[in-house]
Structures are given as C-alpha cells and as structure tokens.
Design a protein with these regions (language model features):
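Acidic/glycine-enriched connector segments
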Residues: 2-198, 203
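Basic, amphipathic N-terminal segments
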Residues: 218-240
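Intrinsically disordered, low-complexity N-proximal targeting/linker segments that flank membranes
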Residues: 201-212
C-alpha cells in the first residue's frame, strides 16, 4: 500500500466566492415593475453563477426591507444562494417599519443569516445608514434600484450609492420607473450629487460583458472573508 507524507500536504485552496448586495426603493411596486426587476436581478445572479465554478460560495446581502431588498432576497434564495441579512434594529423593532408585510419579512429572516446593527429608534437614520454601508463593505457588486432623482436623506439609496462609488464598489443600476437596460457604474467619477446616470456607463450587453469580466477577476484573489462584524455591527441574531 502506498504511503504519503502528510507533512507535505498543504491546505486546500479556498473556494471562489462572490457577494451581491442591494440598496433601493422601499415603495410598493406595481406587478409589472416587480416582474421586470425580478427578471433583471435574476439575470445578474445567473450571470455571476455561470461565470464561476460550480463549487463557488455565492452570497446575497439584503436588509429585507419592503421593495428592492426583498426582490434580491427572494431571487437569491430561489437559486440556492446564502442570504445574509444586516438589520438596522432588532427584528421586533424593525418589523414596525412594515406592519402589513411582517409575515413575509419573518419568512425571509427564517432562511437568512441575520446580523444586527447596534442601533435604535432614537438614531434610526444612522442605523439605516450603518446597515447600508455594511452591505457595501461586504459585497463585490451592489444592485441599486433607484429612479435617479428621489432623495431619501441619510442612509437612503442615493447616499448609499455615493458611498459605494467612493469605495469603488461596482453598482448595477436598475431604474424602477423605466424599462431600460442595467447600467454598470464603475467608479466615483461616474456619479455626481445627486447621483445621475453617466452617458459613458456601459449598459445592456456591454454591461453584462463587463460584469462577467469583473466576476472572473475574483478567481485570482483570495476567498471573500466572512461578513465584517466590526464597528457598529453587533452580534449574530438567532432564535426569533
């Protein structure tokens, strides 16, 4: 029987990984718009998965608010992705934001890895901002569902997009008000304040090609670290 010197066996190579985050409108979407955005989000997730090996670690980060957040959460879970849910408050407090859809929130939370920001209602905007920035710091591409003009103040979609652009996190911009192809925002210079669609940002087929190249580049880097729990991010939430 052949023998092997186990002292010469190195550690297994890390699995390739990719993380998709979300920021976007919380308003109610009509069925046609919701269907279109769900399709566009699914196309991005499928593009990522098709570009990486079958053993890749695929993660979606969503705070699970009504609207955009849940579109990504549902699409990711339907494809077998791991869902991470950074929450601005403890779930019992956060549920007050959407009294009509608490059951849908709980259903998603039960299938996610929840993380809680150490925030409270007395500093709600700071907590929303912290959750949004956590998503940006821990994703490889950020989906932004935004109409291009609404300003939500601190922690809103426009502010989180600016934060992502400054951090050079690619933004996959989907417009809920127009059936246009996605725009890929690649750098801070392509966004002004308030953010607006740059004329030179790739869209449609060109954006998808650049996305595939972006995903492929992750194969040459170390695996993504676990979510950053430093700073405002607190403990792992369980048992709800």
């Amino acid at each position: 029987m052949a023998t092997h010197d186990v002292s010469t066996i190195g550690p297994a190579p890390p699995l390739p990984a990719f993380r998709v985050g979300i920021t976007g409108t919380r308003r109610a979407l009509d069925p046609a718009t919701q269907e279109r955005l769900t399709l566009q989000i699914g196309e991005l997730l499928d593009c990522v998965a098709a570009t990486l090996p079958g053993n890749a670690s695929l993660r979606a980060l969503s705070p699970l608010a009504e609207g955009a957040d849940r579109l990504l959460a549902e699409a990711a879970l339907a494809r077998g992705w791991h869902l991470v849910a950074p929450l601005p408050f403890p779930p019992k407090d956060y549920k007050a934001d959407f009294p009509a859809t608490q059951e849908a929130f709980q259903s998603l939370l039960d299938r996610a890895e929840p993380l809680i920001v150490d925030g409270g209602r007395d500093s709600a905007n700071a907590s929303y901002e912290a959750a949004g920035r956590f998503v940006v710091r821990n994703c490889d591409v950020l989906i932004a569902i935004w109409d291009g003009h609404t300003k939500n103040g601190r922690g809103g979609t426009a502010e989180i997009m600016r934060f992502a652009a400054r951090a050079e996190v690619p933004i996959w911009w989907l417009n809920p008000d127009a059936p246009t192809p996605p725009l890929l925002i690649r750098r801070s210079a392509e966004l002004a304040y308030p953010p607006h669609a740059p004329t030179d940002a790739p869209s449609g087929i060109k954006a998808e090609a650049e996305l595939r190249a972006l995903v492929a580049r992750t194969l040459t880097r170390p695996a993504a670290p676990p979510p950053d729990r430093a700073g405002l991010i607190g403990h792992l939430v369980s048992g709800f």
